[in-house]
């Protein structure tokens, strides 16, 4: 999720018994600047502190199989780490791909923002290839019968934007096909969420193999997250695939989870990385984690005040606090003990460093108190 950079961001672990309870001064539409806490240490920060773990990662995807945790992250051929617990120790054990992605575009050597799901007897690793700041992108998928390294088959292209077959069709003609996330319901129906900047976050249904889009995307595509008014100026890049004429909308990194009776759509909003410590964005413009919910996996998703995420809504769940800066790239891991929200963040004030400690923060939940 987010534009790939050399900066190592952090995954966090909050020692909580449920997703944290706090007040966020009310839900605010994305068009308005949020009064997100400044990252300097403040005792009144309403978010839980972090618990350190020695693990460097960006855009994490974690699954739990037979007592072992597997993490998939950006890096050459998609890195795999394993650990006996979320606390670690995490050990790099190999990669998903044995070679560069078979998709002939973008950064084929180090695909971005992988997400791995287990469905039936197969593990699916969805990934993106792109070039930073442009929407000439594609989403691919690899499969294996086991979650560890070795035995993965790269099936290549699933969807693409910018150039190539199908990129001129709706919704790919206006979107950026990165940050893939796949949800498979109890009925076996699969859905692909994707999108970064441009026209926001979209969803298309997948067929039963999870290797192809089902139906006609022109009628089946759903725009899940968007904001009409762009908060950032338009790019002046000479390549039309690298500029947004109406301005930039920093929405990306979606993830869909289910906690009966609601489907929760999580996403990241704001600037993810490449921070200048002497000129940080205004408070609330850096990454934060937002959410909306719906009774249907297809939406529409709304925040606490009933605002549609496709019209600027979004409940702030976690934002900068203490030494945590720009948390995002979030996902939810469902365990017997409850749902676990995990994410990466940049450590303040060393937000530019390439060598930093990592904190694995998990918000364990038996109830979604942030919605009360």
From Swiss-Prot:
Catalytic activities: Endohydrolysis of (1->5)-alpha-arabinofuranosidic linkages in (1->5)-arabinans
Pathway, per record: Glycan metabolism; L-arabinan degradation
Pfam families according to UniProt: Glyco_hydro_43 (PF04616)
Top-level taxon in the UniProt lineage: Eukaryota
SUPFAM superfamilies: Arabinanase/levansucrase/invertase
Matches recorded under InterPro entries: GH43_arabinanases (IPR050727), Glyco_hydro_43 (IPR006710), Glyco_hydro_43_endo_a_Ara-ase (IPR016840), Glyco_hydro_beta-prop_sf (IPR023296)
Leader peptide range in chain numbering: 1-16
Biased composition (Basic and acidic residues): 35-45
GO molecular function: arabinan endo-1,5-alpha-L-arabinosidase activity
Descriptive protein name: Probable arabinan endo-1,5-alpha-L-arabinosidase B
Active site: 59, 252
GO annotations of cellular component type: extracellular region
Main location (coarse class): secreted
Function: Endo-1,5-alpha-L-arabinanase involved in degradation of pectin. Its preferred substrate is linear 1,5-alpha-L-arabinan.
Membership in a protein family: Belongs to the glycosyl hydrolase 43 family.
Glycosylation sites: 363
Compartments reported by the entry: Secreted
GO process annotations (BP): arabinan catabolic process; xylan catabolic process
Annotated site residue numbers, Important for catalytic activity, responsible for pKa modulation of the active site Glu and correct orientation of both the proton donor and substrate: 179
Catalytic activity, EC: 3.2.1.99
Keywords, ordered alphabetically: Carbohydrate metabolism, Glycoprotein, Glycosidase, Hydrolase, Polysaccharide degradation, Secreted, Signal, Xylan degradation
Residues covered by region (Disordered): 26-52
